[in-house]
């Protein structure tokens, strides 16, 4: 009985709640059908008390039986046409959806998301489509919460473009859609965005730490918060530190330790919170501001940028997407290890030289670091 009730409820919802021109025709016929059945009905109702008599007389319709019959069969015809049209339309739609590939890219590192894989979220949202997924898991390169083997982890990310190319070549460009979600160290999230910058259909999700689930970015809202810029001058004219405080403040003492006598540009949000990143518009706008700052540094003659970024995964990914691999200068995105004697021990180096792959760049051992170690 429960199964029968479920089938009836789902059928009613499909016929009377789903929006389509075909079902509009079906509903028009369904609304007229009972009216035609009532065309010849007549009845009398009386309510009698000691003091009054109330009666209701409903006479049969004066509409000729021929017109009632025409209306009856016409309503059935509308329902039949609408239902047949909707079935054909649904079959065609399902065939078109089956051609489409939704490629889910999940990256695991800082938090174990295996209990709520990204592919499950994608399957619920994109029902009927061909779902393909890949998981880049670098937890075997981590020890005690730090990245102990960055070169090994980097190899897994460099295969990402090949994985996408394999799947994209099997369908038309408009039928290929990427859904990205990760929780990995900032340099790898930035690199992932950089590698996928040429992909037009990318939906970016982030991990909601409060709900322990994947969450989509809001495409509409924007608090219009802007970066506040500060400058620390130094003698170097080729290399510069670009420090971005998005979700929390960067470690300025660690920057001084790892990059001494190097000029610094700091871009800071006043409201630095772990949940200040859910606006897609905000991320895109601030990514544009970041790139404009890089272009200004390039015009000033700096050709080696040391990027220190404190942000959520989706923000780092968005910033990486915005970084033009052909026209912007060499950049290294550094990993922060708070308890390490070298707080910024390594970074992922990205160059604009043709055919040059991103690589791991170790922090140079200076006199200040020697004293700290």
Question: Locations of the language-model features?
Answer:
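N-terminal alpha-helical membrane-insertion module
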Residues: 1-97
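C-terminal functional regions that serve as terminal interaction/effector modules
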Residues: 298-300, 313-373
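N-terminal topogenic membrane-targeting module
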Residues: 58-78, 84-174, 185-186
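Gly/Ser/Thr-rich loops at beta-strand to alpha-helix junctions
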Residues: 108-112, 174-191, 245-250, 306-317
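A short, acidic, amphipathic alpha-helical segment used as a generic capping/interface helix at domain edges
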Residues: 162-169, 283-301, 315-318
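Long, charge-dense
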Residues: 198-228, 270-279, 330-356
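Redox- and metal-dependent alpha/beta enzyme cores, enriched for Fe-S-associated oxidoreductases
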Residues: 223-292
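Hydrophobic, ordered structural segments
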Residues: 168, 172-213, 316-319, 324
């Amino acid at each position: 009985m429960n199964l029968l009730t479920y089938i009836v409820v789902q059928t009613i919802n499909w016929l009377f709640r789903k929006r389509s021109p075909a079902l509009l025709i079906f509903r028009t016929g369904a609304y007229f059908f009972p009216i035609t059945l009532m065309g010849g009905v007549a009845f009398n109702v009386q309510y009698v008390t000691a003091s009054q008599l109330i009666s209701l007389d409903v006479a049969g319709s004066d509409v000729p039986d021929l017109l009632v019959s025409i209306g009856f069969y016409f309503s059935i015809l509308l329902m039949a046409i609408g239902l047949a049209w909707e079935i054909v339309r649904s079959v065609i739609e399902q065939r078109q959806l089956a051609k489409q590939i939704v490629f889910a890219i999940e990256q695991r590192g800082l938090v174990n998301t295996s209990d709520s894989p990204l592919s499950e979220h994608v399957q619920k949202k994109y029902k009927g489509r061909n779902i393909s997924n890949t998981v880049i898991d670098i937890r075997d390169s981590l020890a005690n919460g730090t990245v102990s083997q960055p070169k090994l982890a980097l190899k897994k990310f460099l295969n990402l473009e090949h994985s996408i190319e394999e799947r994209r070549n099997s369908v038309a460009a408009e039928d290929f859609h990427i859904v990205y979600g990760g929780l990995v160290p900032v340099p790898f999230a930035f690199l992932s965005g950089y590698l996928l910058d040429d992909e037009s259909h990318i939906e970016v999700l982030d991990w909601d730490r409060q709900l322990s689930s994947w969450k989509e970015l809001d495409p509409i809202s924007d608090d219009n918060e802007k970066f506040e810029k500060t400058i620390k001058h130094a003698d170097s004219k080729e290399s510069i530190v670009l420090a971005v405080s998005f979700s929390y403040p960067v470690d300025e003492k660690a920057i001084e330790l790892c990059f001494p006598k190097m000029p610094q540009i700091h871009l800071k949000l006043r409201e630095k919170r772990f949940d200040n990143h859910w606006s897609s518009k905000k991320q895109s706008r601030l990514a544009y501001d970041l790139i404009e700052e890089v272009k200004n540094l390039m015009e000033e003659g700096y050709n080696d940028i040391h990027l220190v970024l404190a942000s959520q995964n989706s923000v780092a990914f968005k910033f990486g997407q915005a970084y033009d691999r052909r026209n912007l200068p060499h950049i290294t995105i550094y990993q922060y290890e708070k308890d390490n004697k070298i707080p910024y021990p390594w970074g992922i180096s990205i160059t604009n030289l043709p055919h040059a792959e991103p690589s791991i760049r170790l922090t140079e051992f200076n006199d200040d670091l020697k004293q700290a170690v």
